Amino acid sequence: MAKKPKKLEEISKKFGAEREKALNDALKLIEKDFGKGSIMRLGERAEQKVQVMSSGSLALDIALGSGGYPKGRIIEIYGPESSGKTTVALHAVAQAQKEGGIAAFIDAEHALDPAYAAALGVNIDELLLSQPDSGEQGLEIAGKLIDSGAVDLVVVDSVAALVPRAEIDGDIGDSHVGLQARMMSQAMRKLGASINKTKTIAIFINQLREKVGVMFGNPETTPGGRALKFYASVRLDVRGNTQIKGTGDQKETNVGKETKIKVVKNKVAPPFKEAVVEIMYGEGISKTGELLKIASDLDIIKKAGAWYSYKDEKIGQGSENAKKYLAEHPEIFDEIDKQVRSKFGLIDGEEVSEQDTENKKDEPKKEEAVNEEVTLDLGDELEIEIEE
């Protein structure tokens, strides 16, 4: 690249200095009007990374790519009936309490089973529960809890059950076109900034509906309009697969079901990953089962025939005996869990960078190319002005 004339360099410096001064004056004026921290360079932010909280499931943490749910973000969990949506959300509640946080459950469906929640590890004595009379009331309660900054997790079960007051006060058969969608759109606009500011995780459980007259494509949709789809940083599609049979005397009895959780949207890691978990009836996600499977695939736990072994020590013949061993030896469970997470670069409560649209390896080269292009364009313009 040819060296710039001396006069051209002086003009460039003067031009750049004036722009920098104008920018600094504008930043000072914005901070004066709206307060310190209202605008800043991204590199000056104290928190450039997104903190995460474990979902309570190792397989789901891996599928999420970041090690859990991002704090200060909206999560949507949807799927067919009895697919395990509430179970997935309750595991998040139990995990939040385990980490010393406070969780709230907005039960719009009025269907929460305290005994089942306790079986999943939820401390029901500490859980904040609200069963609102209308959708507006439920969202207002959620908003006040989030604004307080004292709640770490808010679960709304479910969006479909958030019935607008006008619909409740009206008669059955009255038309209320778009009423719930407008309510959710307004709620998302109000809650979005507050959720991010307080670092609260907001989980919205949603149901499925079918579009009438769809001949091609997926006819499934979720109620409540499109606002939640846009504002959600993570969307999980939960689907029940095959039934799990028991062993011994229960070999003909269904004791659980294999459930597939697909990450259909993810703003902090690559999307479209899947997690397959075993949801045992009355117990929730089998943590020993998912750890045994993943650790075996990574060869952390060795499998020879029907025997499972760890560090040359046999831990059980058959998967059920190996699961039982892991459940009875929590120190071994935690040790293997840490090894698995380290393999995937996941640590509980870690911070992860925002996912960029381009490959990170190419970023420095692209940035240099952009800077060089801008400099050349500026120089060409200045040379033309001098010639004139």
From Swiss-Prot:
One of its GO terms (cellular component) is cytosol. It is found in: Cytoplasm. It comes from the Bacteria. GO terms for molecular function: ATP binding; ATP hydrolysis activity; ATP-dependent DNA damage sensor activity; damaged DNA binding; single-stranded DNA binding. Residues 357-369 have a biased composition (Basic and acidic residues). Pfam families: RecA, RecA_C. Keywords: ATP-binding, Cytoplasm, DNA damage, DNA recombination, DNA repair, DNA-binding, Nucleotide-binding, SOS response. The keyword DNA repair applies. ATP binds at G79, P80, E81, S82, S83, G84, K85, T86. One of its GO terms (biological process) is SOS response. Residues 347-372 are annotated as: Disordered. The keyword DNA damage applies. InterPro entries: AAA+_ATPase (IPR003593), DNA_recomb/repair_RecA (IPR013765), DNA_recomb/repair_RecA_CS (IPR020584), P-loop_NTPase (IPR027417), RecA-like_C (IPR049261), RecA-like_N (IPR049428), RecA_ATP-bd (IPR020588), RecA_C_sf (IPR023400). Belongs to the RecA family. Can catalyze the hydrolysis of ATP in the presence of single-stranded DNA, the ATP-dependent uptake of single-stranded DNA by duplex DNA, and the ATP-dependent hybridization of homologous single-stranded DNAs. It interacts with LexA causing its activation and leading to its autocatalytic cleavage. NCBIfam families: tigrfam_recA. This is Protein RecA. It comes from Streptococcus pneumoniae (strain CGSP14).
